């Protein structure tokens, strides 16, 4: 042998032949499967002239027909009118199917010649389908593309009768259907029998041999394009026996089954025909032209014996599970349970299933986090306070998203036989009256007749036909008759399920006691054996689910994580504001009237567009602009609804109108208020909304409320805002002189009116003309705006009624502290300029109109001014509003007589408060505009040096601005810190925003801007000066680095004081070395000004814990903080934290996501996985959190799945915080310290306090960690002190550990 090896001889290796059952043997089968009959002959033959198919019209095909005829004969409808069918547009093609179900969706394709199945992607099949007929090598046929839960689903609607009889819609638990997310028919992911909607795509020449649809299902079949030819064989016992023999013979290709039976019918279906094939009918199909067909399969209660017979045939012919009806016997159990429940009101479902299906009252918890401050503005399609007609309209809106159960008509009776009038959980067999909470829940969930239903369930009446063994409370006041077909079906189901062996009964988990259920069905059959078949034909299904409404959800679900303080305060307000209600659609604005856009993230989530349907939100473009109070809202004081329609006097109308406070959320009549010394602030942007006098008197302020659709209103075609702008522009073009004269006469006219009538007149005139309530300058065209500015600057004169005031000086409208802090900036103003600004503002305050409106009015209007309008406190009537549209600020400049001194003080105090508020809104919106429009500009330009002599905004440009020039409002940055950085700076040391030096731009970019061919980047910012210039021009003896050494010893509060000294110190004190850590912990509101301040300081550590920061804000921040290393986001929402999943996330060292709402294993996977939004050139496929050293995960609902991700993606992890994680156990620690894991050697500190599943065993796993120094097991109930002492003793050989506290182990130095 050695010689043979050395000789270099190589023997040939012989591989053993391996056989694969999936091996393609199509070449062999092509020879074997040669058809033994001529298909062309069968198409021309006159032998198949049976008359089984009945032609009908859609209007005659209703549920009453089903109860009478039981769907036993084939039906053809030459027109789909009256059937309730919905189909795509006529130009819909197979290519559109691919777009809607996904080009990568795998479909089962049948090779017609070999009758062998294979798989293709939709993209591949569409390419084949569009290939010319002459170039097709083979004939492929798609007959099993189920498209539920895809975008195609809601373009196709089944016949109404099919929805009413389908077991899937009416028997299968609805909450299981809602859990279905997988669009394919993978059995492992299937939550219900997914056979409702199929798309069949066949090319010319395709032939499907004789077959019976799986499970004995009936079939609806609509020829959308092309045509079909059917051969039909009735399911007699003889024919079924022949069929079974034919299938088992294996000679299907040799024998045409239609020739073996007594009678067979051939029928041709043309384009637009709808066909119904009953259960058990044997049929073959030929495609004469390329066709596109939509159809579906159903099981129903009117031919159950045939359905069971076909299922048994499938058992005997050994049909593969892939081609059978899924969950067949499970469905049978649910059918029995639903019939028993709807007839006797006794449920055999588990308690959990009953709660899910609204059959009993779910336990409701009261939580301080139950309501968010914006919940009164939540606009959902199924609002819980809709009027009955509004509910119908909303159900029509939701019709395409719902299933057949949602379309099931409710029985006309008000008795317990109605599935919607169900007994509560605590109602027992003795007829005990339900508890009050259950009654309240029923009242919330039932319709207008619910009171009678509750009475009927709580006080049952005796009936002679009480089902045997049924409690007295379950007796219906009106007997429900079952058809003979249903009775036969129920009997067949009971016999079949009883005959099954235990291992094949397939009892679903929702059935609590299957044997008791069978007995209950037998009792029902005994009681209904004498039912009148005529009375059973009612046209109404016996079985249907209770309609789910929005009341099943928590009404005030918070949108984001609230801080504890705000949550508690909100709950207190909730208890006092009993009349608070969720607002509903106005149904008048353009947003309410339009259809879904199909493009926004809410639309993409909807089931009708192929999404999972989890968000339950309406389209962004359909969010109401002006949501109204629901009809159930009543006054908190008198308990009555709004009665403004009962009077004609305008002042009386307002006093009887319901107003909702945007701060305390109380709904009240203004006339019912006892507080008269203060004034309310009416919100023009939202109907029936104000800041009530009580909150205003207490000095509370709230965020301006608007309808959720207001910010999208300008995008709506034909929106109200666009119409207002066009109308306003037309009026300005036609009547400029008339408006000016009206403005001049307005103060005189109003000063003569009675003071008490001023509020009502002004309010209602402006309310009636909605055009003036929502005037927004940012929707104007840029050329109109610039032209108007030029005209107003030329026309300004001391005597004119309308003067230009681009922005009031900051010091004039702010508090004394703010004015003192602005001294430095005011000194930079030119001598005459400051006086001119103050004179103008004083004149506008002292005129007669202002005194009347501020001193005598109980109410005032406030509006959010657009970015280029000024905050205005003096209210204007319609005439002054019209004049204001021609200039940024319009108002009478003539001074009136001085009023009483007290009124003057009150007026000035309110004026300052309002201007402060408006100014803050102005600056916030300006920065929001910058965030959206120029993301990178602000970070660079905000650090540009401040000019030695800034100009006041009152200076107009000396030449008109061309359209291509767009001045930048933030080109100088924001000097000082935002006032909201209160935790770092303190209440008394907030630096002011400086006066803007250039006029604001229009909101939309000028149309004549020509796009550059190359990227234009901003110039680099100039470095801060090295020395401090003095008044005489010389430089201070101490240079910048010396000053920086001094500044490093100052607190952030002191730095803010220094920033107000001069421009040089302002820039020096903003150096990032002085702001390595910024703490905004528990800050109530994160504003754009605060974000800009953070960006300017470039911190290394940022604490945003327990704030309401949004995803957009956090994304904007992390894009501009490349040096950020420590980020604290504890208590925020997952929506905000998900901003870290982007490729722009900095390489953090410390990440704190403790108590983040909604952060679970799936979210951890998104957080730790490599980002998918890499920019061109970014080839790094590693996690952006790979440098994490310290990770805090306390209070999260995570499991070992997340720990595996941590081990994989965080090789440097040293400190891990897992306290209050209830799923962490000893196995989790074993996983962290296993051989080969990076955490075994890198972990130094682990916090497992309050992890109740951790035991002493975990300590033995920690022995593997070579660098462990700190183990916190405090408050772990299953960890003992003895176990800790044993760990210390065993570790003492190599490392000395001690118990600093009980169960707190620390390495001793």
UniProtKB/Swiss-Prot annotation:
Sequence ranges of Basic and acidic residues compositional bias: 404-413, 722-772, 915-933, 955-968
Residues engaged in binding Fe cation: 211, 213, 283
Comment field on protein domains: The LRR repeats are required for the interaction with the PCGF1-BCORL1 heterodimeric complex. The JmjC domain mediates demethylation activity. It is also required for repression of ribosomal RNA genes.
Species this chain originates from: Mus musculus (Mouse)
Domain F-box: 1032-1078
UniProt cofactor note: Binds 1 Fe(2+) ion per subunit.
PANTHER family in the cross-refs: PHD/F-BOX CONTAINING PROTEIN (PTHR23123)
Biological role: Histone demethylase that demethylates 'Lys-4' and 'Lys-36' of histone H3, thereby playing a central role in histone code. Preferentially demethylates trimethylated H3 'Lys-4' and dimethylated H3 'Lys-36' residue while it has weak or no activity for mono- and tri-methylated H3 'Lys-36'. Preferentially binds the transcribed region of ribosomal RNA and represses the transcription of ribosomal RNA genes which inhibits cell growth and proliferation. May also serve as a substrate-recognition component of the SCF (SKP1-CUL1-F-box protein)-type E3 ubiquitin ligase complex.
Gene: Kdm2b
Lineage: Eukaryota, Metazoa, Chordata, Craniata, Vertebrata
Sites where the protein binds Zn(2+): 635, 638, 661, 664, 669, 672, 692, 695
Protein's name in the database: Lysine-specific demethylase 2B
A GO cellular-component term linked to this record: nucleolus
